[in-house]
């Protein structure tokens, strides 16, 4: 039985011996320090294999048909094929030195589209990076190499790709700004003006000599020969399960996506006149390029994935989709907009309950973000300048979107995401130190008097370039959010784009990263001072955002999301997630996706949206209800945080081993103390159960203290509020007012932070805060007050008012009926009394 294999082995040995003779042919000497080919000597050994599979050997009429033989073990993916080994036949041409000139010798011309120098290094002996190609089995296991040419290896370009008449693709408005003499910083080796990190109109003029460092790109599949280009930067995204790296050069991008939970994907972008070369056993004249669409007017895109062989494979569809991205637009804003839109669609799909697997969004979103950085790098190369606002925009979007896609699409832990990019801002350390100095020098009280757009510029830079919370920035953020809260609870705030962005950046700048509780303290400060201050202020911000997330605001915010999703269904919109940012997205309310709140949202959707939201695939009611659930579900996402803010800022909830039931609301009301609202009673804390609430949706309020793992039950007592107007002391400060419905829906949670809010609480019908005005209550609404010491009291004033409130129509009808009854009674009495007085009965008797 071993005879065929013995013959095959002898044939392989003879072939190798013949190949050794060919190596004696004079070839250019290996440059010093180049190559790692100690295996190519006269003592080459072949290990004996019991089973060897040998593929077809192609002859080459134009060159010597001698091939070098490498034998490697492999696990066959074909069913019923035994474990064995493969014989790889590498063309002799791969032994020759590269045919192209060194890339460093041809520096790019400023602003010249022909500037990119991208070369494919097809060589073994003269290749410093040969080792991965000899040791890796990825080229087999991922099936990127075809044995024969297959249909679909080179596929048609997308309809959204650029054309010869429009080579740059879609360009958004407004047009890109031009450099200004007053705000331009030149990188020409001379004295430089200090970089103003908060002035969005600052322009950086690039020194192209800084981009002459070469990048050697090596395919992670070990399926494409190394590619050399001028390096411009690197973008990294990832978490504990996924890593995404984009290597960027002049006219070049190599994107690698690898994940524990999902198949890998690689995308390579080169100039349209460059041909990358794939490793296969074809002779040089038949050597394939990697798979991808046909070349475009500027670039050529290759894509490698697990689905290259299977046209109906999910990865095949994803590969063809992302391959179109680099050629859709050179405007980085276009790609950031679509990355934001895909993120919204991902959150909506998860919230609607239609799907729990949204991993395909990972490829789409991270590819968009990578292409955005590539597009910006190319625009910088072609224009020789960069606007500071472009750098901040890219970095801010990376920090906003990456944690969401890593958590929901890649399956990573909530606090394991990371991202960085040196494409837009290669002076990150300079920017970080400058923003820290600017913030340390500001006067918070004076800063508060500035307009909101200046707050946005400052906090935006802090959010983008400070990886730790800065004391003054946290204090400023807290004061700004408090000012918004004062207006929001009175329904006097206008949630325009500036207000939404200020709120988002304030929350993000205050929170920083979740490591703030263990960061080194500021110089000269006690070890615990900064951490306790940051914790206290962030707890207060959580509470204020929760209080701003009233039922009416949640409905209006949900309606805004409905309109965005209606536009998505109707044909697509381009936007930023910050355009729909809401206090609810930074709050500790987890109940907005419940049925009651969804129905509240659906009740106010304008009729014009019903046509847009109806896709025709479902019944109208089902479709509308699904979008309502999606909108409210998105409000439940805390997109301002790249970590689990509740667990970090409310450690008392995890101080005991007892696991809490599903939480509706968390109220960090005092240091190390929080109220938690649930549907079922937890086995920890002081617990209250509300009476008169739908038994299917009960409301349970628990007061949890850090380290106290005992459980006790208490009864909510009714009471009237004492009017504290005669004293300057704030009696109810630190308390939370809750308005709820007998159906079990929580309407409002108003935090009483000062005397002004306290006086509005007892003002009755004259209150300027709608939640405190009993005239706006219906018989199905009640209110209670949660004190910071753990006492909960039912507000009798609001309950009694609602109990005796009757419609005016019923009242007037009752009065009319009463008057009519009195009139009828009067007539009867008049008749009786009149007959007796006039002796009518006597006359009647006499007559008889």
Curated annotation (Swiss-Prot):
- Which coarse location class describes where this protein primarily resides? virion
Q: How is it modified after translation?
A: N-glycosylated, O-glycosylated, and sialylated.
**Lyase is among the record's keywords:** no
Where do the record's region annotations for Interaction with gL lie?
240-303
Q: Where is this region: Disordered?
A: 166-191
Specify the signal sequence span.
Answer: 1-24
Question: Where on the tree of life does the source sit, at the highest rank?
Answer: Viruses
Annotated transmembrane regions: 809-829
Sorted UniProt keywords = Fusion of virus membrane with host cell membrane, Fusion of virus membrane with host membrane, Glycoprotein, Host cell membrane, Host endosome, Host membrane, Membrane, Sialic acid, Signal, Transmembrane, Transmembrane helix, Viral envelope protein, Viral penetration into host cytoplasm, Virion, Virus entry into host cell
Glycosylated residue positions: 36, 41, 45, 60, 119, 182, 210, 496, 672, 766, 789
Subcellular localization(s) per the UniProt record = Virion membrane; Host cell membrane; Host endosome membrane
Write out the topological domains of type Virion surface.
Answer: 25-808
Query: Disulfide bonds, which pairs?
Result: none
Q: Name one GO cellular component term.
A: host cell endosome membrane
Annotated family: Belongs to the herpesviridae glycoprotein H family.
- Describe the subunit structure: Interacts with glycoprotein L (gL); this interaction is necessary for the correct processing and cell surface expression of gH. The heterodimer gH/gL seems to interact with gB trimers during fusion.
Q: What is this protein for, i.e. what is its function? A: The heterodimer glycoprotein H-glycoprotein L is required for the fusion of viral and plasma membranes leading to virus entry into the host cell. Following initial binding to host receptor, membrane fusion is mediated by the fusion machinery composed of gB and the heterodimer gH/gL. May also be involved in the fusion between the virion envelope and the outer nuclear membrane during virion morphogenesis.
Question: What name does UniProt use for this protein?
Answer: Envelope glycoprotein H
Q: Which organism is it from?
A: Equine herpesvirus 1 (strain Ab4p) (EHV-1)
């Amino acid at each position: 039985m071993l005879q065929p294999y013995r013959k095959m082995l002898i044939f392989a040995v003879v072939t190798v011996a013949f190949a050794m003779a060919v190596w004696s042919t004079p070839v250019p000497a290996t440059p010093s320090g180049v190559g790692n080919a100690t295996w190519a000597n006269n003592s080459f050994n072949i290990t004996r294999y019991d089973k060897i599979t040998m593929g077809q050997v192609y002859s080459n009429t134009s060159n010597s048909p001698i091939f070098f033989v490498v034998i490697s073990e492999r696990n066959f993916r074909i069913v019923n094929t035994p474990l064995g080994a493969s014989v790889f036949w590498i063309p002799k041409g791969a032994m020759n030195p590269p045919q192209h000139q060194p890339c460093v010798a041809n520096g790019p011309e400023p602003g010249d589209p022909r500037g990119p120098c991208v070369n494919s290094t097809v060589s073994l002996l003269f290749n410093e990076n040969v080792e991965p190609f000899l040791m890796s089995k990825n080229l087999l296991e991922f099936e990127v190499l075809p044995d024969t040419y297959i249909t679909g290896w080179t596929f048609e370009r997308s309809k959204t790709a650029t054309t010869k008449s429009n080579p740059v693709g879609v360009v958004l408005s407004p047009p890109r700004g031009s450099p200004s003499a007053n705000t331009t910083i030149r990188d020409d080796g001379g004295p430089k003006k200090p970089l103003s990190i908060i002035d969005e109109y600052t322009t950086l003029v690039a020194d192209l000599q800084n981009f002459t460092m070469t990048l050697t790109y090596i395919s992670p599949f070990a399926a494409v020969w190394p590619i050399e280009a001028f390096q411009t930067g690197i973008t990294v995204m990832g978490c504990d399960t996924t890593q995404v790296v984009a290597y960027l050069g002049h006219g070049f991008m190599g994107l690698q996506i690898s994940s524990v939970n999902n198949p890998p994907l690689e995308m390579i972008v080169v100039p349209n006149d460059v041909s990358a070369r794939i490793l296969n056993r074809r002779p040089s004249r038949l050597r394939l390029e990697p798979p991808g669409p046909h070349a475009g007017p500027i670039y050529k895109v290759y894509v490698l994935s697990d689905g290259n062989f299977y046209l109906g494979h999910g990865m095949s569809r994803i590969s063809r989709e992302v391959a179109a991205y680099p050629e859709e637009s050179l405007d980085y804003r276009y790609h950031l907009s679509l990355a934001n839109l895909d993120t919204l669609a991902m959150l909506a799909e998860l919230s609607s309950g239609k799907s729990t697997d949204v991993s395909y969004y990972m490829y789409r979103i991270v590819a968009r973000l990578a292409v955005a950085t590539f597009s910006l790098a190319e625009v910088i190369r072609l224009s020789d300048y960069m606007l500071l606002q472009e750098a901040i925009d890219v970095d801010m979007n990376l920090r906003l979107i990456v944690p969401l896609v890593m958590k929901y699409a890649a399956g990573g832990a909530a606090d394991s995401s990371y991202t960085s990019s040196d494409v837009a801002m290669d002076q990150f350390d300079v920017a970080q130190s400058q923003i820290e100095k600017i913030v340390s020098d500001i006067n918070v009280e004076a800063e508060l008097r500035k307009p909101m757009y200046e707050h946005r510029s400052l906090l935006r830079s802090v959010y983008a370039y400070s990886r730790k919370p800065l004391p003054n920035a946290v204090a400023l953020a807290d004061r700004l959010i408090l000012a918004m809260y004062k207006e929001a609870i009175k329904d006097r705030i206008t949630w325009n784009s500036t207000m939404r962005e200020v709120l988002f950046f304030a929350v993000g700048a205050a929170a920083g990263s979740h490591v703030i509780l263990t960061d080194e303290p500021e110089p000269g400060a006690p070890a615990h001072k900064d951490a306790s201050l940051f914790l206290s202020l962030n707890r207060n911000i959580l509470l204020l955002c929760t209080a701003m997330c009233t039922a009416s605001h949640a409905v209006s915010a949900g309606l805004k999301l409905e309109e965005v999703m209606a536009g998505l269904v109707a044909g697509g919109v381009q936007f930023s997630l910050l355009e729909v940012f809401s206090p609810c997205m930074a709050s500790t309310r987890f109940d907005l996706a419940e049925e009651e709140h969804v129905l509240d949202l659906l009740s106010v959707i304008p009729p014009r949206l019903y046509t847009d939201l109806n896709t025709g695939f479902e019944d109208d009611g089902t479709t509308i209800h699904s979008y309502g659930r999606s909108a409210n579900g998105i409000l439940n996402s805390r997109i301002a945080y790249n970590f689990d803010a509740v667990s970090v800022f409310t450690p008392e909830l995890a101080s005991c081993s007892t696991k809490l039931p599903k939480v509706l609301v968390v109220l960090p009301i005092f240091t190390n103390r929080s109220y938690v609202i649930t549907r079922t009673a937890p086995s920890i804390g002081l617990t209250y159960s509300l009476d008169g609430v739908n038994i299917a949706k009960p409301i349970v309020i628990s007061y949890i203290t850090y380290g106290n793992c005992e459980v006790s039950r208490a009864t909510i007592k009714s009471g009237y509020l004492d009017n504290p107007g005669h004293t300057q002391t704030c009696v109810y400060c630190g308390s939370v007012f809750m308005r709820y419905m007998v159906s079990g829906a929580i309407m409002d949670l108003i935090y009483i932070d000062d005397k002004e809010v306290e006086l509005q609480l007892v003002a009755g019908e004259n209150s300027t805060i709608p939640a405190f005005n009993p005239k706006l209550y219906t018989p199905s609404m009640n209110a209670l007050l949660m004190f910071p010491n753990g006492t909960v009291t039912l507000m009798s004033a609001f309950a009694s008012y609602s109990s005796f409130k009757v419609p005016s129509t019923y009242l007037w009808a009752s009065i009319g009926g009463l008057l009519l009854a009195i009139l009828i009674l009067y007539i009867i009495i008049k008749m009786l009394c009149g007959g007796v007085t006039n002796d009518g009965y006597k006359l009647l008797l006499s007559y008889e």
